[in-house]
Amino acid sequence: MAPYSLLVTRLQKALGVRQYHVASVLCQRAKVAMSHFEPHEYIRYDLLEKNIDIVRKRLNRPLTLSEKIVYGHLDDPANQEIERGKTYLRLRPDRVAMQDATAQMAMLQFISSGLPKVAVPSTIHCDHLIEAQLGGEKDLRRAKDINQEVYNFLATAGAKYGVGFWRPGSGIIHQIILENYAYPGVLLIGTDSHTPNGGGLGGICIGVGGADAVDVMAGIPWELKCPKVIGVKLTGSLSGWTSPKDVILKVAGILTVKGGTGAIVEYHGPGVDSISCTGMATICNMGAEIGATTSVFPYNHRMKKYLSKTGRADIANLADEFKDHLVPDPGCHYDQVIEINLSELKPHINGPFTPDLAHPVAEVGSVAEKEGWPLDIRVGLIGSCTNSSYEDMGRSAAVAKQALAHGLKCKSQFTITPGSEQIRATIERDGYAQVLRDVGGIVLANACGPCIGQWDRKDIKKGEKNTIVTSYNRNFTGRNDANPETHAFVTSPEIVTALAIAGTLKFNPETDFLTGKDGKKFKLEAPDADELPRAEFDPGQDTYQHPPKDSSGQRVDVSPTSQRLQLLEPFDKWDGKDLEDLQILIKVKGKCTTDHISAAGPWLKFRGHLDNISNNLLIGAINIENRKANSVRNAVTQEFGPVPDTARYYKQHGIRWVVIGDENYGEGSSREHRALEPRHLGGRAIITKSFARIHETNLKKQGLLPLTFADPADYNKIHPVDKLTIQGLKDFAPGKPLKCIIKHPNGTQETILLNHTFNETQIEWFRAGSALNRMKELQQK
């Protein structure tokens, strides 16, 4: 042992590599399961180490943590071309997670593939289809009744194909992943844009569309454009009213909603140790709002503490042995560096209408007065996948206790969403839930609820101007309640609680006083709460369905008359010709998020039925021609009508069409319906100034052409009444622009260039009609 250990040490020094534990160099001494639910699926730190060593020798430089985990999962580390921001990496993720709104389409596609079982550990989580109305138990019962067909499909499909199934009421996908599946060094993909939440436990967890998930479940290497790495150095320490949420609210204000596009945000520095594991998850979760591929923190004692408290001390011990691979190398290079002194950071609140409009809480009241935003807060809402941990609930309860001690309750309506059944049961046991009820709160079901528009709001009418404050992640127009006049702000749960008690945006809990029931003034003290329960977590009800060992007799039925589920028909292949005389369905003015393209809320019930869900295509996008939403000119009849109706008219009459968009088109959710719908209704291309990462990939997967103006000013050359011809598809090649001929009604023409990011594999998707079609072609060879 000694001579070999010495040899390894000398070799590492010669290569400029940090010295590793002898145990990790030799072998993985003990097999440790990835989760309690999959006892025969093991963590492969030995393979991670081997791949990192291969890549390190090739690159001959220190590696960031992001690079270690990503490159450590390369399909072919010895030969993979690696260049940040340019090359496409072929990766082997460790697992897949899907929420119920996206799992329907993902499983329908997997069924279409003809494969018998998933190739990697996979889970389905029921959290998106539960509407908030009356409170937890009643809303859950109603959801089970309304969504019985969908839940039965997902449960039986999971059983048939080897996918774990978390029943409705189990909690929000990302909290369940953090509690059970995420671990340092994991590469996990999830069909939800807030999958990066797992970065709080040291994993690279990336939001993708369902077609990407199908690739991984089918055992096909997953492609990701080699990400750049943005370093955020944290110094100082959090204290007082400042919370982990304020870190990402500050970063969002710096980088904006697209500043992280194509990059992993990697937090490091001495300030990291002052943040709890669930606090790190909060920061990583909301990294989706800056367009980041994902975010990650280095493994530390806070993660070890969380792993141990959630029954995974064996994983923590193994991570300790391999810790050198779970932190960045000294001297590693970041493409951009931001430094934040946590000791100087103030509580923030971002909004309205965009998550990157950052304000210190101390200033938002005066800004609101100046801008004409409603000062009175109608509703305060805490929870969501971003902020529903035990610590979040504890800090909010600490604020509420102070108000109750002075005889006060919330002036605003107040709702609480526990992140999981485990969190719900534990805060009930420890008294937090009752304190939050006593101050005026309603505890909702363990689900997404109002955060994704599942909110049957009764206190206002549509079009009524009002303000809400949430601890959620997104505040796009109409996202939470479908009211475009709701001014939504995002902040930490404790600030939401304080503002709900005060009832106004003008209240600053750091400096302002409240008046108690006895008429005496008092100031709220900064909340203090345990990051983890002192006793063990209470798991609550058992909500997990294991896939059976033998599923040969399992049936998965989809009724041909169902309004909720629809088996998929393959999209048509490319006909080998250029796209001639495309009609412009809509030229979008300004921001066009995934909520504008295909809203959630009441439309979630159609996520498994492509034709029905297509009836909401682009109904939120603003038409530049008339400055209206869901009103576009039919080029044949010359009448204005809803976008989906016009698209269906074009499809019925054999008219192919295109969408023209602005900057960061498709920011927001990972749901691939935003790509499936335009493809289903006859769309062929989306041309914009720039795309959000996930949406661009989703469009490619479904055989559409996401293209960008070589000169962004060319956006202004195109008018809604023009026709477009896209040339160069016969010689379609990576890095080679396509030509676009703009044909104006007066007979004049202009030619512009359109860029794309297709690689060879993705071009094959286009030619086959979709990535799924291409998968079937390869299976038949």
Swiss-Prot record:
SUPFAM superfamilies (UniProt xref): Aconitase iron-sulfur domain, LeuD/IlvD-like
Localization (cell): Mitochondrion
Pyrrolidone carboxylic acid, modified sites: Q28
EC number of the protein: 4.2.1.3
Protein modification: Forms covalent cross-links mediated by transglutaminase TGM2, between a glutamine and the epsilon-amino group of a lysine residue, forming homopolymers and heteropolymers.
Residue stretches of biased makeup (Polar residues): 551-561
Cellular component annotations (GO), alphabetically ordered: cytosol; mitochondrion
Domain of life: Eukaryota
InterPro entries: Acnase/IPM_dHydase_lsu_aba_1/3, Acoase/IPM_deHydtase_lsu_aba, Aconitase/3IPM_dehydase_swvl, Aconitase/IPM_isomerase, Aconitase_4Fe-4S_BS, Aconitase_4Fe-4S_dom, Aconitase_dom2, Aconitase_mito-like
Transit peptide endpoints, chain numbering: 1-27
GO biological process: tricarboxylic acid cycle
Co-factor note (free text): Binds 1 [4Fe-4S] cluster per subunit. Binding of a [3Fe-4S] cluster leads to an inactive enzyme.
Enzyme class: lyase
PTM-bearing positions, type N6-acetyllysine: K50, K138, K144, K233, K517, K523, K573, K605, K723, K730, K736, K739, K743
Family, per entry: Belongs to the aconitase/IPM isomerase family.
PANTHER family assigned to the protein according to its UniProt record, in alphabetical order: ACONITATE HYDRATASE B, ACONITATE HYDRATASE, MITOCHONDRIAL
Designated name of the protein: Aconitate hydratase, mitochondrial
Organism: Sus scrofa
Phylogenetic lineage: Eukaryota, Metazoa, Chordata, Craniata, Vertebrata
